[in-house]
Structure formats: structure tokens, C-alpha cells
Amino acid sequence: MVLSDADKTHVKAIWGKVGGHAGAYAAEALARTFLSFPTTKTYFPHFDLSPGSAQIQGHGKKVADALSQAVAHLDDLPGTLSKLSDLHAHKLRVDPVNFKLLSHCLIVTLAAHLSKDLTPEVHASMDKFFASVATVLTSKYR
């Protein structure tokens, strides 16, 4: 999925508003994912999956850091996320549908915290951004 210039502007603007909350928002989105889609828990058998746990917070920071890198390199998502794609495809073997589920929960979390900023246009751009990230992360599954 190709991000337009307007999409890139929207993604950078909303991610700028996320700011220092990125890790917390990503952790909240992970907790939402695990609660709403219990099958996603199978990849984390060693985690305390209760909302707010140190492990959820830690993994949320990893997700947020990866997304922040993606936002900073919107014109080179494949290069930016290549190592992460290798990890998820070859070592972790995460079912690709889980990226879509997490993306949905990330949008819900953004809406909960930044409702005034998540206009329909920004929402559409973030959907495209998360879909682009998911496409890159699953590109090495083939």
C-alpha cells in the first residue's frame, strides 16, 4: 500500500502527538489485543499477560520503538523493518493475521487518547500506515 504525501503528513503529525506516550499506548494496544483476541496469546506463553504487567510494558516499548522508526523512515519501510521482518517470519513465526489485529487495537487506543486529532482522514492514513507496516513484516513469510 502506497502512502500519499497527505498520508505521510497525517502519520507524522499524529505520531508527534503520541510523543513520549508511545510505549504506554503500544502496551495498552497489546493488552487490548490479548483480551479481545485470545488466540494472540499463544506467542507469549512465558509472559504475564495482565494489563500493565512489566512484560506487556516492555514489549509495548519494543513495538513503539519499531513504529517510531517506521514513522521516521516512511519512504523506506522495507529497509527500516527488514530485521524485524526476519525475526517474525523465521524465528517467531507469528501468524500474519496478528499484525492486523494489533493494528486495529492501536487505532482504538489512539482514538481513546487522541480523539480530537484522529479525524477520519488521519484515521484512514493510520490504517494505511499500519497496513503497510504489516505488509513489510509479513513479506519474508513467502
Swiss-Prot record:
This is Hemoglobin subunit alpha. The modification N6-succinyllysine is found at K8, K12, K17, K41. Residues 2-142 form the Globin domain. Heme b binds at H88. One of its GO terms (molecular function) is oxygen binding. Involved in oxygen transport from the lung to the various peripheral tissues. The modification Phosphotyrosine is found at Y25. The modification Phosphoserine is found at S4, S36, S50, S103, S125, S132, S139. One of its GO terms (biological process) is hydrogen peroxide catabolic process. Red blood cells. The gene is HBA. It comes from Dasyurus viverrinus (Eastern quoll).
